[in-house]
Amino acid sequence: AGEDNYYDGAKNLVRSEDGKSYIAAPISGWVQGIWYDKEKLSEAGFSEPENWDDILKIAQHFTDKENKQYGIAMPTAEGTMSEQAFSQFALSNGANVLDDEGEVTIDTEKMREALSFYQNLSQYTMPGSNDVTEIKDAFMNGTAPMAIYSTYILPSVYEAGNSENIGFAIPTQKDQAVYGTVSGLTISSGLDEKQKEAAEAFTAFLSQPKNMEKWVLMSPGGAQPVNKQVVELDGYKENEVIKSFGELPSEI
C-alpha cells in the first residue's frame, strides 16, 4: 500500500525501537476520547469541552445522584480501560511513565496532578466499578451526557439513530492527548521458507487498500482506517454508517 500512504500516528505505533524499520503492517486502529451529547450540553449552555476545567464543570452540572443522573461515564474498575482512560489525562498534562532516557518518571508533580484530577472527576460518574459495558450503557441510555470510550461506541450510536448528535472532545491541559491503538499484521520468526512466503503473501493481500477497506467496514465507525487510500474508496465514503456521522470520522 506504500509507506507514505499510512498515517504518521499508525506508523509511529509500529515503528521499531531504533526507528529504522517497522515491526508490523498496520491494518486498522481505534481512538479513545470523550464523547458527548451535543443537544444536552447545548441546552445547558455548554459548548464542546476544551480542557480539564470544562470537563469538570459539565460533569458537575449534570450530576444528580438522587435521580441516578451522572455527569460523565468513565472507567473506575481495576483494569485495562481505567489505565487507558487515565493515560490520556496524564499525557495531556505532560506526564509519562518513562522519560526520553527510559527512566521511570511516575512520581512527578505532573503525574500527581493528573491522578488528582481523575479522582476528582470520578465523583461525577456512576457508583461502583465501571468498565466497558457500564460506561457504554450509561451513555447510550442517557444516564450521562459524556463518556470516555473508544470509537467502537459509534456503531451503537448509529443504530440508535443519533449520529448527528454525538461530539468528540480530546482531553487537553498542557497538550492534547488521546489513547489509541493499532492492529498490525506481523510475520513470526522461526518460520520455514514456505511458511514465510505464505505469510508475506497474506500480509501483502490484506494490506491492499480494498481489503483494508473491507476489514474496517466489518465494524464501520469503530475500526478506523490507518491508510489514506482507504478513506478515498467509494465503498468507505458511501457506507451508510460512515456517511451518517458527517465530518466526524475525518476529524478523528
Give the residues covered by each predicted segment:
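Extracytoplasmic/periplasmic substrate-binding proteins
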Residues: 84-85, 116-198
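Periplasmic solute-binding protein
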Residues: 8-50, 75-100, 179-188
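Bilobed periplasmic-binding protein-like "clamshell/Venus-flytrap" ligand-binding domains
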Residues: 23-24, 64-78, 138, 208-219
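Glycine-centered hinge/linker elements that transmit conformational signals in sensory
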Residues: 58-62, 100-129
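Hinge/lid segment of periplasmic solute-binding proteins
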Residues: 1-31, 56, 166-169, 235, ...
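Short, solvent-exposed loop/beta-turn-alpha elements that line the ligand-binding surface or hinge
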Residues: 1-6, 76-77, 93-113, 159-160, ...
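Extracytoplasmic "Venus flytrap"/periplasmic binding protein-like
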Residues: 1-6, 39-50, 145-146, 156, ...
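C-terminal lobe and pocket-closing loops
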Residues: 153-163, 174-252
